[in-house]
């Protein structure tokens, strides 16, 4: 993490810590001012800064930014040094979780919130608020966030929810739930709505691709045979197509994800930082 200075709401903050951007919303270029988070003394050179760790939830944000063709910069949150728990990072996200996206409107945390904000701001990778399919898209996006991803956290970090001696029992109980979640998502993908379709990437498909990648890999020291991509053929088709996208290739290069990061994933070998 970078050096700290006065907090953004402090009367002692530097009077010139403001950023001015021109960035597109729809077809209109909007100029925006944003007060810089006071924990940083440098200035962003792009309208977005992604605070990330390799192969973490920030991967979904990187993929969306790449697919939208948006300029952004990254700041590593080094998990080996527990930087997500530092005072500097908690100024951006008081929960100490990754990712955070700094924007001209301030920092955003929560993966689904960032994805939805980007999609609506830039009118890409999601149905518009006026579209008839918007309601269906929203319910499945938040299913992916509030149900699927929430249960994945229990699988990955069972010791945070129960005594360590009982962690394997908790994991065993959560796996059938995860299988059911994937089955209902696959049934929805069978109907091929434009926001859950092999030929039309969306913030939801990228989010799901990341989560399914992690199911195949983590926890590294636990049974993972319960997850079989072939059990969900319609989702498998989506993941296969996403691997051909330039956005995915950019993420592979940036985070060392291997040539088939979604359909046959390998552990990340990033140039910086650590996935765990």
List where the protein language model places each region:
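Ser/Thr-rich, low-complexity intrinsically disordered segments
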Residues: 1-9
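Intrinsic-disorder-associated, low-complexity terminal segments enriched in Asp/Asn/His/Tyr and depleted
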Residues: 9-18, 40-42
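Intrinsically disordered, low-complexity segments enriched in serine/proline and basic residues
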Residues: 22-32, 36-38
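GST-like domain detector, emphasizing the conserved glutathione-binding G-site
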Residues: 42-172
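GST-like fold's C-terminal all-alpha helical module
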Residues: 144-240, 244
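Charged phosphate-binding loop/patch that engages nucleotide di/tri-phosphates or the phosphate backbone
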Residues: 251
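Acidic/histidine-enriched, glycine/proline-rich intrinsically disordered or flexible terminal extensions
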Residues: 255-276
């Amino acid at each position: 993490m970078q050096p700290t200075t006065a907090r953004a709401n402090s009367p002692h903050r530097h009077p010139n810590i403001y950023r001015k951007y021109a960035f597109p919303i729809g077809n209109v270029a909007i100029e925006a001012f944003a007060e810089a988070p006071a924990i940083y003394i440098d200035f962003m050179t792009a309208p977005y800064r992604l605070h990330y760790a390799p192969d973490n939830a920030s991967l979904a944000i990187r993929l969306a930014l790449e697919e939208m063709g948006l300029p952004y910069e990254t700041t590593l949150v080094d998990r080996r040094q527990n930087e997500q728990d530092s005072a500097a990072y908690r100024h951006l996200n008081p929960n100490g979780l990754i990712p955070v996206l700094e924007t001209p409107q301030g920092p955003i945390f929560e993966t689904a919130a960032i994805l939805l904000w980007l999609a609506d701001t830039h009118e890409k990778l999601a149905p518009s608020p006026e579209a008839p399919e918007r309601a269906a898209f929203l319910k499945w996006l938040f299913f992916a966030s509030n149900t699927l991803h929430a249960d994945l956290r229990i699988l990955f970090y069972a010791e945070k929810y129960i005594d360590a001696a009982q962690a394997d029992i908790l994991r065993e109980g959560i796996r059938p739930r995860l299988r059911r979640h994937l089955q209902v998502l696959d049934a929805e993908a069978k109907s091929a709505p434009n926001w859950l379709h092999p030929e039309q990437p969306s913030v939801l498909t990228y989010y799901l691709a990341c989560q399914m990648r992690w199911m195949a890999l983590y926890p590294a020291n636990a049974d993972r045979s319960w997850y079989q991509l072939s059990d969900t053929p319609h989702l498998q088709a989506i993941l296969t197509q996403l691997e051909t996208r330039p956005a995915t290739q950019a993420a592979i290069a940036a985070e060392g994800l291997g040539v088939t990061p979604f359909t046959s994933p390998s552990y990340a070998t990033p140039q910086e930082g650590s996935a765990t």
